[in-house]
Amino acid sequence: MASLRKSHPLLKIANHILVDLPAPSNISAWWNFGSLLGLCLATQILTGLFLAMHYTSDIATAFSSVMHICRDVNYGWLIRNMHANGASFFFICIYLHIGRGLYYGSYLYKETWNVGVALFLLTMMTAFVGYVLPWGQMSFWGATVITNLMSAVPYVGNDLVQWIWGGFSVDNATLTRFFAFHFLFPFVIAALTAIHLLFLHETGSNNPAGLNSDADKVTFHPYFSYKDLLGFATLMVTLTSLALFSPNLLGDPDNFTPANPLVTPPHIKPEWYFLFAYAILRSIPNKLGGVLALLSSILILTAVPALHASKQRSTTFRPITQLLFWTLVAAVLVLTWIGGMPVEHPFIIIGQIASLLYFMLFLTLIPAAALAENKALEWN
C-alpha cells in the first residue's frame, strides 16, 4: 500500500513538488533563489499582515500610524524593519534569479520565463505602491513623479493620471487605493508563483551544463530540501542582521519627513532596486521616449528567448557570451549608480552610454556573439 503522502489528494500534490520531484543532480547554489523568493514572499506577507493591523491609510494619520507601530506596538519596530528591508532582499534574490536564467539559458522554457517576467512586473508595482504608504516626503513625491509618467500616453494621458490619483493631485484617495493594491498584489503574486511552478514542473529544471539531464535525476528531498535550508538560514540571518543593526541603510532620509506638497525634495529618486530603470528613463530627454525606454528595459526580457541564436543553451562553454553577460551586469550596476546621482555632467552622458549598451547587449551584441560561436564550432 502506498504511503499517505503518495495517496492523499492534497499531500500527493505537495509530494510531487517538494519530495519526489526529479531534479538534475548537478544544479548549483544559483538554483536556490527560486525557493528563497518563496521565503521572501512568505516573510513579506506575514510581516505585512501584522503591519496592516496597525496602519491607517489616511493622509492625516498614515505617517503617525507608522511612528506608532515603531514606538508603541510590541516588536513593531522589528516587524517594520523586517518588512522594509525584506523588500530589498526580495529584489536582490529576483535579480540574481533572473541573472541565473540569462546565464544558463533557462529562458528557453518560454512559459515559465514569461510568467516570471509578469511576476517581476507585479513585484515592482507592489513595491512602488508600498513605498507610498508611510506618507513621507519621498513617498509623496515618488508617487507624484512616477504616476505623472502616465501623462505621456497620447490623447488619454491626463485622464489616465487623474483616474489613478482619484482626483487632481496625489491625495487621500490615492493613498487609500495604493494601500488596497499593496494588500492585494502579494496574493496575486502567490497565485502567479503557483502557475510559474506548474510550468516549470512540466519541463523539469535546467542545469549548469544546459544539457538534458533525464538520465541523471535525484529526488528533491533530501538532497535539495537541505541545500535550500542553508540558503534560507543565510538569507534570514543576513536580513535580521540588517533589520537589527542597520535598518535605515537602504532607505532615504527624506522619508523621515512627513509628506508636504509645498516642498520638493532636492533629489527625487526611488528605492535602490529601481534606480537602473530610473536611470534609463532619465537618459532620454523626451518624456514619451523615456517612458517607452523604461518599459522596454523590463519587457526586453520577454524577447530574450526569441533572440537566442546559439546552438548551445547555457553560456558555460561560450567565453565570448560570458564576457558580454558580465558586461551587462556591469551596465546594470553603472545604471543603478547613475540613477541615484543628480542630473548633471558627467552623470548624464554616462547614463546614456550605459543605457545604450544595456539595449545593444540584449538586441545585437549577445545574438551576434552566439552566431560567431556557432561559426567557431563548425571549424572543428
UniProtKB/Swiss-Prot annotation:
Bound cofactor: record note: Binds 2 heme b groups non-covalently.
Binding site for heme b b566: H97, H196
Any matching Pfam family: Cytochrom_B_C
Chain sites annotated for binding heme b b562: H83, H182
CDD domains: cytochrome_b_C, Cytochrome_b_N
BP-aspect Gene Ontology terms: mitochondrial electron transport, ubiquinol to cytochrome c
PANTHER family named among the record's database cross-references: CYTOCHROME B
Protein known as: Cytochrome b
Organism: Percopsis transmontana (Sand roller)
